[in-house]
Amino acid sequence: MIKASKCNKARALFLVRTSIPRTFIRNATSAIPTTVKLKDLSSLPPLTKSLPTNLPFLMPDTLHNLLRFDSKKEKQPSTDKSNDKDKPSRKEKGKDKEKENEERKDINEDEKYDIKEETDSKPTIDPNNPVSSKSSISSSSGGANNNNNNDDSDGRDDDGSPKDKEFLSPSDAGLHPPFLAIAMKDRPFLPGATRHLHVTDPEVIKCVNHMINSNIKSPYFVLFHVRDTNSEDAALDVIKDRDFVHEVGTLCQIIKTTGSEILVYPHYRVKLVDISTPNSRSERIEMEQDNSQTSYLKKFEVSYAVTQQLKDEPYDEQSITINAWTRRIKELYEKLAPKYEQPENKEEIMNNPSMLADFIASKVHAKPEQIQQILESSNVETKLELSLQLLQVEADADEMRQTALKNIRERTEKAYAQSLIKEYTKELLKAAGIGENSKVHKFDERIKHLKMPEEAMKAYKTEKERLGTQSDMEQNVVERYLDWLTQIPFGVYTKDSFNVKKAREILDRDHYGLKDVKDRILEFISVGKISGNVDGRILCLAGPPGTGKTSIAKSIAEALNRKYTRIAVGGVQDVHDVKGHRRTYVASIPGRIVTALTQAKTSNPLMLIDEIDKLDTTSHGGAARAFLEILDPEQNNSFVDNFIEVKVDLSKVLFVCTANYLGSIPAPLRDRMEIIEVNGYTKNDKIEITKRHLIPAAAKKVGLEEGRVVIPDETILRLIDKYCRESGLRHIKSLINRIFSKASRKIVEELEDTDADPHSREIVEESLVAKENESVISDKAKKDAGSSSIESNDSNTEAKVSTTTENEKKQEQKQKQDEEIKKLDLPADLKIEVKPETLKDFVGPEIYIKDRLYETLNPGVATGLAYNTSGDGDALYIESILTDSISSDLGNAGLHVTGSLKEVMKESASIAYSFAKQFMVRQFPDNRFFEAAHIHVHCPGGAIPKDGPSAGIAFTSSLVSLALNKSLPNDTAMTGEITLTGKVLAIGGLREKSLGAKRAGYTKIIFPKDCEYQLDEIPDEVKEGLTYIPVEWYSEVFEHLFKGISKEEGNSVWKEEFAKLEEKKKSKKTHTV
């Protein structure tokens, strides 16, 4: 039941929100008893001050229901005042003003009557469900209907009977009629603030326009947030199924539409009860929809849902937690208030905890999941806590921003003040004619020792004049340019030394072996001595890693008495790295060439361009083109760096390049170089280098005297064979260092064990005491000598010394001893010997366990030879087998190749297969092996990529061996490219392959006759014990590998298998007939 005061308020409410004459309302409501049931009032959307006053929240039909008219509904005038095509005249305005004054007078009378009614009957407060005594029917502007008000907001009358079933009125089960349901991916909408919604689905847009244009009295929809915002369908407006969205959303009213943009006002939170989608229609909703005012939704392919209003749980207004959090939120909000647009009902929001939580959550920056969590919460305390957390993060971020802005402002003001002081000081010094620029003086002093060309001197003077007339930033650029320009050693040269004898001594001192390399270098120096210079010569040291190319370049520089400088160009792809950046760029510097000259401080250094084969040529060859100019004797006398912008003469520079693989160097660059190949070291060379250089260097590095760690030749040999087979010395050097590190640890542990033995400790202490006595005596003698000199020079010193007590002296001496790190004194007889049997205790288990994969070769297995870019040679085994027996009559003869083979090696295998078939037909015509054999050829070591044509004769021999079912000799390895006609072509790396064959125990090597010239490059110690068999055609290879085989033997190998095959074929024919 509702009292008369509520009727009066409702009457005033209709007057404000509608255009119905007030006199009509007063006359109508005066006849209503005070006990009338008002079923529609609480179900209406809550009002808000932020919406337009001309928005018709209550339709005329609702008014008739309120007045309980049973007669036919009359058409009421439109309340839409937004269309103002016909502007009122001045007379009409005057009448409206008089009417407004009359209505205001009536409102004042109603308010007096309401105050009297409220005084007569004060609302009671339930302790479990506190209410606000300030209003009885008002709801929050955010639309959150609290249970705190003892009014009709629960959707039922005082007697518990259900209300009228208008479009917002809940059913008997407390459910709303079906509404249009829209899914959204962005931040969820919270009640109480007008928002813009963007929709893209054409059906949804049509439905919304229909609701607006058809004057539907229920322009409402429910909005739900998508669960998975990262899914492909997250941007859809139509809900696919119930699990597609969260269960809690908001009921929104459409205010205005503009294309795909909808201005909406979220009223309150709703819970999803049932949903009907275009893909899955709900029978329950469809049946109810037929009699519903929203039945028009069936016309569109949209989703619509039955919802239930989600109300806040009751809470205690006196709760300490709620009051504390509310107070803290208000404090933080006041600090951040300038950032946010202030609502008109701010006071009402601040006094309602639920509205305050929604308002704060709608303002702060947060993830959609966090806002959804607040939206789903019915507990006011929880909502406040979550909103406070978000607001606290916002406040902390704002504080950090303010601090950063303050620091920036302070730095800016300080820099401005410093610049003013600097300019003021500069003007004073200029006016006084004093204060010579120290930097300019430094530049002038530098050029006195240089022979700058005219172009460089002109640039220097021009830039020098600009100093003092530019801004600070520009002046820094000028100073940096002059600094670099005056560091270039124009006209500064070192005198060359062409002493061949001295050069030989330096090369022999620093390098063991490498006879061919040393001879080439000495020839180079001899030519320079005859011609008087080595200008225009560009050397390239090519060889495997770790063979000493860089150290050879240093020895050449020392032999020629030139400065040494190094440029690493591995991976360089930008031409500006070589030629510098222009001064217009921030923090630009010269390129690597000019920088190397400034480091060498001479114009004729030996400049090592290291790893030139690693130069990145993918970026349009920019860096490679720059080196074409630098390494060309006809062009490098006028090299121009982009930063310096003056010509620099590089013709006197001796360029030495290093590379591991010549094929990676661009051909134009390679043509400008004089190639000196630095091959790998032999086994004997490695042993001698280890003894002469690596062991002493490792002992010095760990602080041990030579002889403390003994490594015999047998141990070094085992280290080379089982751990370090590459041509270089880097790996063996690291292993030697590891041996000395382990030996140092063993020595320390052994001494610690000795300290634990009393007898041994006494011996060690006696030796240490004797050493200390010797040091004390020497220190005393020095002290006596020093004290006599002090007495003669200063008479007061003796008095000062006497004042120092003995205890202080002892403390100082002890402190000095603690601070000093003494070297460990080792007994003279303490040594560690690394034997071959104990080598694995120092460097770990052996890497190369077997030298040969096959001790005895089976038919179809051949031994080839291979080598890699690191200079390591090894045996390459070729295995061939039959995948099916010849008598199986499968009819799939062919070749299948595996073993991580690249394109060239696959082609080599195909060529060998074609030639082997032709060769067997010619040599053994009755051997029909290749007619029915499906062969699988494999190269062991599948993880290692293999390429190259040099395994051609090995492939052929493997196939012929399988066809003849005869094994190849165990002592013979082979290398050479094969052609379709059986010609054996030249290959490379014969020296490395010979090392691999000898290490694997092979004594004979079949190689192309065209490679006989390479035998002269192989050291005698490598050729010792090897027999080289040069061949020109494969028939010569066959004679060496298959000696004594007759035609009858070769023709009859597979006769039985082919006989069985023929019988099978005959039986098949008979069966078919």
UniProtKB/Swiss-Prot annotation:
It is an enzyme of class 3 (hydrolase). It comes from the Eukaryota. GO terms for cellular component: mitochondrial matrix. GO terms for molecular function: ATP binding; ATP hydrolysis activity; ATP-dependent peptidase activity; sequence-specific DNA binding; serine-type endopeptidase activity; single-stranded DNA binding. It is found in: Mitochondrion matrix. It catalyses: Hydrolysis of proteins in presence of ATP. Residues 69-173, 775-821 are annotated as: Disordered. Residues 856-1044 form the Lon proteolytic domain. Keywords: ATP-binding, DNA-binding, Hydrolase, Mitochondrion, Nucleotide-binding, Protease, Serine protease, Transit peptide. GO terms for biological process: cellular response to oxidative stress; chaperone-mediated protein complex assembly; mitochondrion organization; oxidation-dependent protein catabolic process; protein quality control for misfolded or incompletely synthesized proteins. Residues 790-805 have a biased composition (Polar residues). Residues 1-27 form a transit peptide. Residues 177-395 form the Lon N-terminal domain. Residues 132-150 have a biased composition (Low complexity). Its main location: mitochondrion. Residues 69-107, 113-123, 158-167, 775-785, 806-821 have a biased composition (Basic and acidic residues). Its EC number is 3.4.21.53. The keyword Transit peptide applies. Pfam families: AAA, Lon_C, Lon_lid, LON_substr_bdg. ATP binds at residues 543-550. Homohexamer or homoheptamer. Organized in a ring with a central cavity. ATP-dependent serine protease that mediates the selective degradation of misfolded, unassembled or oxidatively damaged polypeptides as well as certain short-lived regulatory proteins in the mitochondrial matrix. May also have a chaperone function in the assembly of inner membrane protein complexes. Participates in the regulation of mitochondrial gene expression and in the maintenance of the integrity of the mitochondrial genome. Binds to mitochondrial DNA in a site-specific manner. PANTHER family: LON PROTEASE (PTHR43718), LON PROTEASE HOMOLOG, MITOCHONDRIAL (PTHR43718:SF2). Belongs to the peptidase S16 family. NCBIfam families: lon. This is Lon protease homolog, mitochondrial. The lineage of its organism: Eukaryota, Fungi, Dikarya, Ascomycota, Saccharomycotina.
